[in-house]
Amino acid sequence: MDIGDFVKLELENTTYSGTVMPSLNEDTVVIKMKSGYNVGIDKKKIKNIEILESGDKPKYGLPPLNLEKNPKLKNISILSTGGTVASRVDYKTGAVHPAFTADDLIRAVPELMDVANIKGKVILNILSENMLPKYWVMTADAIKEEIENGAEGIVIAHGTDTMHYTASALSFMVNSEVPIILVGAQRSSDRPSSDAALNIIAAVKAATEPIKGVYVLMHGETGDTVCHLHEGTKVRKLHSSRRDAFKSVNETPIAEVNPFTKKVTYLREVKSQDRSKIKEVVLNTNLEEKVALIKVYPGIDSEILKFYVDNGYKGIILEGTGLGHTPETFFEGIDYANENNVLVAMTTQTINGRVNMNVYSNGRELQAKGVIPCEDMLSEVAFVKLMHLLGNYEFKEAKELMSKNIAGEINESINLEC
């Protein structure tokens, strides 16, 4: 028995005939009788079901908008990987569904029609905590396809939990002349405080700018006045629930974007695009997944490092204390990693500031054991960078490149106002 079938349902003392309708409860059969009334029947009370006539399952949906492209606007592709910003709510069931056809987007955020010609595509539908390195590769491949097919800017709708990891991965993997903007939402579209619509408007606007590179766009403060555009390798989620959870670290944001006036105010120098190469995309998606990120803490045991080495890991990022330190009791594990050609690099768990392993004897001894200081790199960025380097270079060259700036991840000096 399927939706659309005309059926006869026999109960203990009566029968009902009608067309099977969608039901919000899997234990209830709903039919529309010839009288026009709907009736719901508990499946347990049905003694027999007779299909009198098979029907076609009805197709639900709004008619297409049939919008024509505006030749004065740029063509922007919005790729959905899932998350709060990439969904709409079914108020009958409470279910959340992906909403990323172009028509879905325009119906949800009609202001987009004045910003760009929109194309929507779902490439993943996952919660961002379930993001995997192979999905970064899928996303990079989708970006390349869209650009080669005429997209002049890319917006990636992403869950916020791991969005900074993906931004970092794409920064190392994708070399193109178009802006690639990752956008999320902290509050779902059914909540009055939702940031989804304004973030998408601002992200699409940013994607029309004559810049290149990978960026994250989110609310710039708790109100609705401005959104901030952050460099993909210098941004981190710093609050679990606030709408302005994402902040640039050791750097100022690239720009402020007003989602109402569509004004973009640049706050520092930006990478300008070369329009003559707008369809050229170079991908390098090789990743070594056997890389770990370990937070250093008082009493940490060398056996932890030995575990990773013995299980075939090729690289370790240590999130050290202060300027980049570990307890001396951890040195044995570092020696073991070095003896087995496992690349070990150091970031700081203070988040702000930079590693300086020349100040104290602990840091100097760690360097003598082969630990690479990661300057002012964020731990998550260093983790992704090491995956990228070990996936593309031999050990010696990867070690040399770890402390060199490749995709904006290292600042020579830090603005004290950041």
Swiss-Prot record:
Q: Which gene encodes it?
A: gatD
Give the protein name, as stated in the record. Answer: Glutamyl-tRNA(Gln) amidotransferase subunit D
Q: What is its EC number?
A: 6.3.5.-
Q: Which UniProt keywords apply?
A: ATP-binding, Ligase, Nucleotide-binding, Protein biosynthesis
The residues the entry assigns to the signal sequence are none
Q: How does the record describe its quaternary structure? A: Heterodimer of GatD and GatE.
Q: Which reaction does it catalyse?
A: L-glutamyl-tRNA(Gln) + L-glutamine + ATP + H2O = L-glutaminyl-tRNA(Gln) + L-glutamate + ADP + phosphate + H(+)
The entry's function note states: Allows the formation of correctly charged Gln-tRNA(Gln) through the transamidation of misacylated Glu-tRNA(Gln) in organisms which lack glutaminyl-tRNA synthetase. The reaction takes place in the presence of glutamine and ATP through an activated gamma-phospho-Glu-tRNA(Gln). The GatDE system is specific for glutamate and does not act on aspartate.
Kindly give the InterPro entries that the UniProt entry links to this protein. Answer: AsnA_fam, Asp/glu_Ase-like_sf, Asparaginase/glutaminase-like, Asparaginase/glutaminase_AS1, Asparaginase/glutaminase_AS2, Asparaginase_C, GatD, GatD_N
Q: What organism is the protein native to? A: Methanococcus maripaludis (strain DSM 14266 / JCM 13030 / NBRC 101832 / S2 / LL)
Does the record's keyword annotation contain Ligase? yes
- Please provide, alphabetically and separated by semicolons, the GO molecular function terms listed in this UniProt record: asparaginase activity; ATP binding; glutaminyl-tRNA synthase (glutamine-hydrolyzing) activity
| Residue intervals of the Asparaginase/glutaminase domain | 74-405
Task: Say which enzyme class the record assigns.
Answer: ligase
